């Protein structure tokens, strides 16, 4: 049975929506008027959806016409599913892509100094990485100082425990030797030799000043008595106000004992700088200790909360006192040096 003609016509009729009925075409600008558009507003149109950076060597998909960087879309097709990252439409291979030189030309027209922009971006990233590495270094130094302090305390306790065990075992030996000496008739002449040696050893140990009168028991050593003083890490920097920028301004990292004084650091600094200056000049003669004095350099420490205030340190102060009085933080002690005014 044939379909009526009016039914065919009604099925092919396009019914306009309310929006389509009332919309008007946009008037074209024909008088040469220029409209200013900021590049930032075009960023979403010129951005690669994969790397979120500006498109580079633009490739367009043939099916859905989405744009990507050449390296980004090729890597995505190799490592992921064979589909468009934006709309998930099927992409068989690189044959589903085509280069878009016109879009690259448009980007180069909008951003003529793109190479300079990328170079600036690389410099900023390198600076951020360098600052991140410095922060990691300072945090690792702090963790190292904490671990050193913890191990040092354990070492002191272990040393005290071992010394106590040694002294008590020595007291038992003395008691045994006295029992052997007091009963010579029980033992044979062959066993009398070792007993006499042990009694003589107990008499010799009894002459030591740190044994008590009862049983020869050794008194416990004072804390840290068998070890050297604790170590302090410090950073030497040139004084920012008293040392010229083109002068000698090397930063030094020193690790020494806490009982070292400021004069020790001044003399060490004078000797090191004199040796390095001779190496730079190429002189063969070495520097004698008589020519180096701790008066050549003055040591300062920054005491201001916001920086800029420097206090001169007395040469007789130990680093432990300086750390307790001025620093009081779990970071390497920061000191500043400058030539003494009389030595300039």
From Swiss-Prot:
Sequence segments annotated as region (Disordered): 148-230
Gene Ontology terms: biological process: epigenetic regulation of gene expression; negative regulation of DNA-templated transcription; negative regulation of transcription by RNA polymerase II; protein ubiquitination
Zinc finger feature spans (RING-type): 48-88
Subcellular location, record wording: Nucleus; Cytoplasm; Chromosome
Region (Interaction with HIP2): 2-181
Region annotated Interaction with nucleosomes via an acidic patch on histone H2A and histone H2B, chain positions: 90-95
Polar residues bias locations: 180-192
Record GO terms (molecular function): chromatin binding; histone H2AK119 ubiquitin ligase activity; ubiquitin protein ligase activity; zinc ion binding
EC number assigned by the record: 2.3.2.27
Range of residues in the leader sequence: none
Matches recorded under Gene3D superfamilies: Phosphatidylinositol 3-kinase Catalytic Subunit, Chain A, domain 1, Zinc/RING finger domain, C3HC4 (zinc finger)
Main subcellular location of this protein, as a coarse class: nucleus
Keyword Chloroplast applies: no
Subunit structure: Component of chromatin-associated Polycomb (PcG) complexes. Component of a PRC1-like complex. Component of some MLL1/MLL complex.
The protein's name: E3 ubiquitin-protein ligase RING2-A
Organism whose genome encodes this protein: Xenopus laevis
Gene name for this UniProt entry: rnf2-a
